[in-house]
Amino acid sequence: MSNRQWLLAARPETYPQPEHFQLVAGDRPALEPGKALVKTLFLGVAPVMLRYMRNETEFQAPLAIGDLMMGRGVAQVLASDCPELPVGSIVQARLGWQEYALIDIRQNPPPFLLAHHDLPYSHGLSSLGPSGFTALIGLREVGAVQSDDHILVSGAAGGVGSQVSQIAKALGAQKVVGIAGGADKCRRLISDMGYDEAIDYKQGNINTALDQLFSQGIDLYFDNVGGALLDEVLSRLRRRARIVICGAISEYLLAREAQHRFANLQNLGRQDARMEGFFVFDYGQHYPDYASEIADWIRAGQVSPVEDISRGIETLPLALSDLYTGSNVGVRMVHVADPDPMP
């Protein structure tokens, strides 16, 4: 049986395009001792993948030309020599861009079972996967969110941003403002994602909007964008504010010398504030607990996954490109296949 795979064909100078990838067909891998053979159901895409492609990441081995594109997904276990990954189970794991994969419980972070089979499997890449976990970790473990915080979120219509306000509200937050580009995205921030107010950075003056909505300052900023916007937030911090650094998509395409030079970093000291980044995969041992907690919020109607799904493994390059053209809303993923019937 064949196994279609996407390989890295060239390093992009700007955002990923179809010509940077090559679709090949190989053989389905055979089961190996201590591992599980899985069938890919869904694959997710994330902005950080561009850094892998451009050999710019410090926390992951770089991709060489001809390597399998890396990525996380949801899969069904077809055969297993690993008792922790029984046949028929649904797992979320690092699979790569391919239809079948061998996974190992010793991977870091390890695969984990999606025990919430009453919920759609796609949620394993959104609320019950990297996006939801990133939002929860950033808000609670890093940002120490409080009920009276005035919270601002950049990149609010993206995969992580679509979860931040909802999870913040589930944790007790009262006011969350999101920033996105375009009237439709801003409308959806309020109607679908739990935001109280939306700032359209494509319309009007964003600094004026910040001054109006945060006249007393910002307590917690969940940053997915970086750059000049982060600098503006630094100038508007309340005492003991927290800035959670999740991403910097506004600067991923810029050469180092073209990136923003900060003028307001000293305000961290003046306001006894804190700015901290984190790596979601460092919390892998807690994933099952996070998934159980968020699943309860989904069932209670407190969290609603926002997913942007295309069908077919051949659509993966376009799905990744969408993250840089601003055309996606929510967690961008690809439905690769349906699960096999199991006895």
Features from the language model and the residues they span:
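C-terminal capping/lid region of NAD(P)-dependent oxidoreductase domains
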Residues: N3, Q302-I309, P317-P343
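Glycine-rich beta-strand-centered segment in the early N-terminal region that forms part
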Residues: R28-V45, M53-W97
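NAD(P)H dinucleotide-binding glycine-rich loop of Rossmann-like/cofactor-binding domains
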Residues: M69-Q76, P83-G155, Q302
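Short glycine/proline-centered loop/turn elements that form peptide/ligand docking sites
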Residues: S80-E84, G178-R188, K202, I206, ...
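N-terminal Rossmann-like NAD(P) cofactor-binding module of classical short-chain dehydrogenase/reductase
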Residues: Q92, L152, I199, Y221-F222
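Mid-domain Rossmann-like dinucleotide-binding core that forms the NAD(H)/NADP(H) cofactor-binding site
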Residues: G124-Q203
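Glycine-rich phosphate-binding loop and adjacent beta-alpha segment
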Residues: A173, L189, A228-V303, D338-P343
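Short amphipathic alpha-helix with an adjacent loop that forms part of the alpha/beta core around
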Residues: I206-Q216
